[in-house]
Amino acid sequence: MLDVNAHLHTPYSFSAFSSIGEALDHASAEGVKVVGINDFYSMEGYGAWNAGCMLRGLFPLFGIEFISLNEEDQVAGLRVNDPNNPGRTYISGKGLSFPVMLQGKPLQQLEAVRAESNAQVERMCAKLNDWLKSEGHDLVLNFEEIKARYTKGSIRERHLAKALRIALYPDAENPARLENDLRSKLLKAGGPAFVPERPEAFLPMKTVQEIIEAAGGIPTYPFLGDDAKGHFTDFEADLQKAADTLKNRGFRSVEFITTRNTIAVLEQYAGYLEDEGFIVTFGSEHNTPAMEPVRLRTRDASELSDKLKAINWRGACAVAAHQVGLDSADAGEELIHQSIDL
């Protein structure tokens, strides 16, 4: 059984890491042997991820992440895995084909939603410049320059916060915390530079699932789990009902970002879902400025329990098998060991 981190963001979306090489160096140094790239709206990092894994004796998993909208849940006021926006639902894809096979209409749909995501941040940048001027600052942020300097093509409000922090506070003692503060106060809902998403920013849940499947992947529901106060969203509070609904919607894979949750909740939820037939994987995201360990931990412990490690390993083996057209987790396990010469 090997250590797995099946959900890592890279500079192809937003990441704590400055490069794919840095992400994989951290994984290698920490003994994490199976690593999954999982950027928002992008598969462009797959080639570098694959090559970097081969160089370091790691096994690559290929993923992607979307924000979708389920209108039925929205009308019902049901909070799914976005605690502030009913109906808005994050969806990952696991085990996508590499080389990338997406083409035709699904590719056009992906490119359109990514373009709209970038356009929203461009509108945000304009509002941020207006606010800076009103506050007496001479600084003017150049959207295209930020996009070229700090991104691989996909730009988010975190990139604006980073550029602003570097321009105003280049020697900040805690740059990650300051960037989070700037983002929260200026760019999120209620802030002077906030721009709400337009409807075209969100594809229907079913469309996202179809794009993932067209790319060879497994549609995956990311569980939010318990928050710091032990609360769950409307959708996730009843675990059996959530599992049944996910099956009815065509999901057979789920994931958790382990630092959000306690070991007790992870063992309860992940164990139940695996027993229900779901592929279960865990990851860390690393989609904030804060540099955290790649080796997984939980909200209340410095590492996963043996039970959680085993669940994650079995899930990774199933994803690895799917990725190359094999039909069992056992075949995936053999593939991983052969690939990294264990």
What positions do the PLM features span?
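Acidic/histidine-rich helix-loop elements
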Residues: 8-18, 192-193, 225-234
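Extended, intrinsically disordered, low-complexity segments
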Residues: 299-342
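Hydrophobic, aromatic-enriched interface-forming segments
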Residues: 125-201
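Extended hydrophobic/aromatic segments used for targeting, binding, or gating
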Residues: 203-213, 217-279
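Flexible, glycine- and charge-enriched loops at secondary-structure boundaries
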Residues: 39, 198, 232
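A metal-dependent hydrolase metal-coordination microenvironment
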Residues: 2-155, 249, 255-316
